[in-house]
Amino acid sequence: MNLEETMPLVFERSIPGRIGFSLPESDVPETNAGDYFDQAYIRSVPADLPELSELEIMRHYTNLSNHNFGVDSGFYPLGSCTMKYNPKINEKVARFPGFANIHPNQPESSVQGALELLYDLQTSLVEITGMDEVTLQPAAGAHGEWTGLMLIRAFHEKNGDTKRTKVIIPDSAHGTNPASAAVAGFDVVTVKSNEKGLVDVADLKKVVGEDTAALMLTNPNTLGLFEKDIVEMAEIVHEAGGKLYYDGANLNAIMAKVRPGDMGFDVVHLNLHKTFTGPHGGGGPGSGPIGVKKELIPFLPTPVLTKKDEGYTFDYNYPDSIGRVKPYYGNFGINVRAYTYIRTMGPDGLKLVTEYAVLNANYMMRKLQEAYDLPFDQVCKHEFVLSGNRQKKLGVRTVDIAKRLLDHNFHPPTVYFPLIVGEAIMIEPTETESKETLDSFIDTMLKIAKEAEENPEIVQEAPHSTYVKRLDETRAARKPILRYQKEV
């Protein structure tokens, strides 16, 4: 079944002259756009916009929405993405008129309630991470990574230590880590993992040196394993004059149990749209605050939100600041949702989040290891990585398993990542799923493993029940069609 056959594009539905909404006649004099804009910016022909009735538009987009899959639709075990349920109380609070109807250009005196919320959120994140200060400016995780690395760069440059041009990153790291380091102007050095899936400390000692600016780590790492040698690694990097950067993508595994700051990390970024239930998966907006230790505070993006006797205010007096990294003060709506979540859960609730996330992951891992290879057989944290190598020998690849899950109304896990595991299947159940849901997914995965043995074609040709089958993902990435062009 082809989506283009079952549901034409809105442009293809257009009927010339069909009007969805009629505007009243203008009661002010008409003006000529040419009096205000250069001719180069004025259309010579009207925009080719679709013409449909309101009913047709409503049906079109309602039907499209039925093709979507999200956390509210079903189980979404996308590894390293923390696709947990987003409580709807978050949406209610974010829609309070006092939050939804304000503007960042208003005088500070008129938005003290909003500033208080942001300040309290910063304070909460300081406590959760063990940092000394937090900025809410970065818009998402990778943006937070880049911002944190720019702070580290500014710190070294301020100290005249310009030879520190290298950032060390594990071979199991998120792809955004080396990308962020490169964009921040650093050279990337890879440190190997050992046979247990952890950073090889001996190899780290070899690559650390006078040119080391920072070591970027995710803890637990992308295999879902806790880096037990983190204190020793922090000492190695600090003795060499470098900084330790924490990728907060996996904070859901340790939140309210241990703090990155207590492990020796100097900079932390968080994903409020993941760990703290700001909705994600649709392209944004997100929120990627960073926390820093005391010696990096002078380099924070301005303005810095502070509390004084007369109220909350933005402080621009940071001469060593790296400057703004986003217009205004971060994605306010996502920050409201994260604050609501933290206040709703409280310290004890956040601890339970971690405990249930880890419990669910270990339960699933043990149930699935009978049918799939488990490269690192040890207690995991919030997620775990299987390998489809056993199925590959039968002619069924990990991508086939992922596509077959669609027929059972499950979103596939992350596949082929981390790169150090062949035919990787990365599963993160999160804390919000019930045992019944986990068991249903486990049964389906075991069934697919059985199909790979007895009827591999049904897996190789999956999905069978979706609106579209297999897309040419390589072509879509290399030759994207990003806008509609009318056939002449």
Swiss-Prot record:
Pfam families reported in the protein's UniProt record: GcvP2_C, GDC-P
GO function term, MF aspect, one: glycine dehydrogenase (decarboxylating) activity
Keywords, sorted A to Z: Oxidoreductase, Pyridoxal phosphate
Reactions it catalyzes: N(6)-[(R)-lipoyl]-L-lysyl-[glycine-cleavage complex H protein] + glycine + H(+) = N(6)-[(R)-S(8)-aminomethyldihydrolipoyl]-L-lysyl-[glycine-cleavage complex H protein] + CO2
GO cellular component, one term: cytosol
Entry-linked InterPro entries: GcvPB, GDC-P_C, GDC-P_N, GDC_P, PyrdxlP-dep_Trfase, PyrdxlP-dep_Trfase_major, PyrdxlP-dep_Trfase_small
GO process terms (BP): glycine decarboxylation via glycine cleavage system
Function: The glycine cleavage system catalyzes the degradation of glycine. The P protein binds the alpha-amino group of glycine through its pyridoxal phosphate cofactor; CO(2) is released and the remaining methylamine moiety is then transferred to the lipoamide cofactor of the H protein.
Quaternary structure note: The glycine cleavage system is composed of four proteins: P, T, L and H. In this organism, the P 'protein' is a heterodimer of two subunits.
PANTHER family (alphabetical): GLYCINE DEHYDROGENASE (DECARBOXYLATING), MITOCHONDRIAL, GLYCINE DEHYDROGENASE, DECARBOXYLATING
Listed name of the protein: Probable glycine dehydrogenase (decarboxylating) subunit 2
Source species of the chain: Listeria monocytogenes serotype 4a (strain HCC23)
Gene behind this protein: gcvPB
